[in-house]
Design a protein with these regions (language model features):
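Acidic, metal-coordinating catalytic segment for phosphate/diphosphate chemistry
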Residues: 2-29
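Unchanged
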Residues: 61-86, 95-147
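Hydrophobic "anchor" residues
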Residues: 38-39
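A conserved beta-turn-beta hairpin within the catalytic core of GNAT-like acetyltransferases
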Residues: 48-54
Length: 163
């Protein structure tokens, strides 16, 4: 007989409640690097009213129930960044555990085959103050989301699972 600690369960939420305990989040993230190895990030608008307001965030979306990871990756471009659709390639997966909220994050990491143009970077959509390439070593608790810092740490040790 399994104890509660050994049981797995899933909750399908129409609207994600990020305050829910024991939450499993499956996300698609866009990891585009420039020639210096800096990663494309968005700076979320200061008035966004979310935990990420005013901070750097790696563009990403929560996957819809039953959605293919590549479709979610394309939504990062068209819905999150509101830029032209283009071919993407899966470059990795990551798993992160958040002790504070008891959340488990499973991430599909994509990059665009065709680079995002400077014109697209210079014209961020509503809700994003700025798109830029950031040296992830410059990410701090004050200027970036925990998710960005988790991804940065995982990129240092490819293949390591963080749960």
């Amino acid at each position: 007989m399994s104890t509660e600690n050994h049981k797995a369960y899933a909750i399908k939420q129409k609207d994600i409640d990020y305050n829910e305990k024991d939450l499993l989040m499956v996300q698609a993230q866009l990891i585009n690097c420039n020639s210096k190895g800096h990663v494309l990030v968005e700076k979320v608008s200061k008035d966004a009213g979310t935990y990420s307001a005013g901070k750097y965030y790696i563009p990403g979306v929560a996957m819809k129930f039953g959605e293919h990871p590549e479709e979610a990756g394309l939504r990062v471009l068209t819905e999150e960044l509101e830029i032209d659709d283009r071919e993407i390639a899966l470059v990795g997966t990551q798993s992160h555990w958040n002790d504070v909220k008891n959340h488990w994050y499973l991430l599909y990491l994509f990059e665009t085959v065709q680079p995002i143009s400077q014109e697209e970077i210079d014209n961020p959509c509503e809700g994003i103050d700025e798109l830029l390439y950031l040296n992830l070593e410059d990410a701090t608790e004050e200027n970036s989301t925990q998710g960005l810092r988790d991804i940065c740490e995982a990129m240092k040790i490819p293949g390591k699972t963080y749960i």
